[in-house]
A protein has these predicted regions:
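Conserved PLP-binding catalytic core of the aspartate aminotransferase-like
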Residues: 272-305
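Conserved PLP-anchoring active-site segment centered on the Schiff-base-forming lysine
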Residues: 83-104
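Phosphate-binding glycine-rich loop
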Residues: 49-89
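Active-site phosphate-binding strand-loop segment of PLP-dependent enzymes
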Residues: 111, 117-182
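Short acidic capping loops at alpha-helix termini that bridge into adjacent secondary structure
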Residues: 63-67, 167, 174, 196-197
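PLP-dependent enzyme catalytic core of the Aspartate aminotransferase-like
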Residues: 303-304, 313-345
Length: 345
């Protein structure tokens, strides 16, 4: 059974801090577009996502045949694994669990590069030494989930070069990239055509609060690999509502700009309050905060109607590590009030 954030079904929580979607909510234009798509539910979706493909290629300034769509980023991860069929997969740890879930489908052996707490769980240059010819595939979440740490472009290029030298396929998960203060400084999007062994993973889920619509995509300049991915993907995996919603979302530039402005301000506020309450707070760069507290904090919050993400099931983490998303100020004030109540007994 998968264990992720957002486990609200069958429970009654008044505030869900366990999922990292944009707290500003789904844009109204996206909701209306999805509704128009739902009205066409008697039809099969466009298997090639033509309108969405054209809009996204223009938005990212890339070629249309460099995009593969999926039913969320997780769907693209599984398709990439099935297409490459790696025998050995390397990931930093802790990181997003879905990479390992997908690797199990092809019975790949997992290798982990354990990130050190004394280094704030940052990926260091020692990772390059692990990129040897016996590794077939690498997944790199940037910024990382759950730690929020981000790898800068110079280091990403060094990793991509080493992977290219040793025949390793590199998947860089940039699903949280838009939440960084300078997204381009932490992205390989501009280097897509330089590396045939590179795929960038992105989704509409987090930035546009579209988790329930399921729309993710992979970007890659290797045409043969993209064709293989298409063979490994189920047809009609992207619904009409999701395709319509994606086209509408790409027009919401003002919504994204305002969201990022709010999230950065509230992230500073929340980090400061967590530190004031005595928690060990790490340098998370995205729309969530990674921190250390008493192992029973999730239970204590749950008893007060608030769900937070217990990270103890992540490889490389012991009990006592948690992740919370950044929400609107009124909600963040309530979280702080509850945490203060717990701390003060």
């Amino acid at each position: 059974m998968h264990n992720h954030g957002g486990e609200i079904y069958g429970h009654h929580y008044r505030l869900d801090y366990s999922v990292n979607v944009n707290c500003m909510g789904t844009p109204e234009s996206v909701i209306r577009a999805a509704a128009r798509g739902a009205a066409l539910s008697a039809r099969y979706p466009d298997v090639n996502c033509r309108e969405l493909r054209t809009a996204l290629a223009s938005f990212l300034n890339i070629k249309e045949d460099q995009i593969v769509f999926g039913n969320g980023a997780a769907d693209v991860i599984f398709s990439a694994i099935l297409a490459w069929k790696p025998k050995t997969v390397l990931v930093p740890a802790p990181t997003f669990a879905e990479y390992e879930q997908a690797a199990r489908v092809v019975d790949a052996r997992m290798e982990y590069y354990i990130l050190k707490e004394e280094n704030e769980f940052r990926l260091d240059r020692g990772f390059l030494d692990e990129l040897t010819p016996d590794v077939d595939m690498v997944f790199l979440c940037n910024p990382n989930n759950p730690t929020g740490q981000a790898v800068e472009k110079d280091d990403l290029l060094a990793i991509a070069d080493r992977c290219a030298e040793n025949g390793i396929f590199l998947v860089v998960d940039e699903c949280f990239n838009e939440f960084l203060e300078e997204p381009k400084a932490y992205s390989l999007l501009g280097e897509l055509e330089k590396y045939e062994n590179l795929m960038i993973l992105k989704a509409f889920t987090k930035t546009y609060a579209m988790a329930g619509l399921r729309l993710g995509y992979g970007l890659c300049a290797n045409r043969a690999f993209m064709e293989k991915m298409a063979e490994c993907s189920q047809p009609w995996s992207v619904s009409i509502p999701a395709q319509f919603a994606g086209v509408a979302a790409l027009k919401e530039t003002e919504y994204v700009a305002e969201s990022m402005k709010h999230l950065r301000k509230e992230s500073i506020f929340l980090k400061g309050e967590l530190i004031r309450l005595g928690f060990r707070v790490y340098d998370s760069r995205a729309n969530y905060i990674f921190f250390k507290a008493a192992p029973d904090l999730k239970q204590a919050c749950g008893e007060r109607g608030i769900l937070i993400r217990d990270c103890s099931n992540y490889k490389g983490l012991a009990p006592g590590y948690f992740r919370i998303c950044v929400k609107k100020h009124e909600e963040n004030l309530e979280l702080v009030r509850v945490l203060e109540e717990i701390v003060n007994g």
